Amino acid sequence: MDKRISIAIDGPAAAGKSTVAKVVAKELSYVYIDTGAMYRTLTYAALEQKVDIENEEQLMEVVKNVNIEFQQGENTQLVFLNGQDVSEVIRTPDVTNRVSIVAKHRLVREEMVRRQQELAKKGGVVMDGRDIGTHVLPDAEVKIFMLASVEERAERRHLENLNKGFDSNLEQLKEEIAQRDKLDSEREVSPLKKADDALELDTTSLSIEEVVQKIMSIVSGVFAK
């Protein structure tokens, strides 16, 4: 397995992309790039600066002054904003419910995509997001599009919130996830959609281990070529 390929994992909110991508990266000793965390970090920075997140010009001022870095912690990947560890705070419902608004702006996405491509240019990466296979890494050797029902995704996010000590309402989460799906798939710039050459993987009734196993067997097939 000397060949160092790029693996793109796309899908809607709470489909389990990050969880699976981290495990796949670990198995292959690849770098994991969480593009969602990049948009979350930008959203957090904008909220902290009391910026109007509907205003692209104001957001671009924030982008210019934002340095986002990833570091591998003991059991998880840490996210830093201008040297400050924001790994936990970018997962709060406040940020979660606004990240799709920040991500819909054309200039913001163009700059973030440029940064993501820069991080991935040497290969040996697993990257997850909404537009990785279609836009960020269109030449990725492996492209996966992960799906799960709104109910299943709301359940997962609900458990995640409770485990982190956040208040959580399952019915409200279903509405919020459906709304994020709408925003992500209808936005003008790089909407959420399956790349023509991506393999679709419905994870509704699958465990993390089963999903990882399926992806690893796809990767093995690429290495065997």
Swiss-Prot record:
Catalytic activity: CMP + ATP = CDP + ADP; dCMP + ATP = dCDP + ADP
Entry annotated with the keyword Transferase: yes
CDD domains associated with the record: CMPK
UniProt-annotated binding residues for ATP: G11, P12, A13, A14, A15, G16, K17, S18, T19
EC number: 2.7.4.25
One Gene Ontology term, aspect cellular component: cytosol
A Pfam family hit: Cytidylate_kin
Gene3D superfamilies, sorted: P-loop containing nucleotide triphosphate hydrolases (3.40.50.300)
Keywords (A to Z) from UniProt: ATP-binding, Cytoplasm, Kinase, Nucleotide-binding, Transferase
Localization terms from the record: Cytoplasm
Gene Ontology molecular function, alphabetical: (d)CMP kinase activity; ATP binding; CMP kinase activity; dCMP kinase activity
GO biological process: nucleobase-containing small molecule interconversion; pyrimidine nucleotide metabolic process
Entry annotated with the keyword Metal-binding: no
Highest taxon listed in the record's lineage: Bacteria
Family classification: Belongs to the cytidylate kinase family. Type 1 subfamily.
Designated name of the protein: Cytidylate kinase
Species of origin: Bacillus cereus (strain ATCC 14579 / DSM 31 / CCUG 7414 / JCM 2152 / NBRC 15305 / NCIMB 9373 / NCTC 2599 / NRRL B-3711)
Species classification: Bacteria, Bacillati, Bacillota, Bacilli, Bacillales
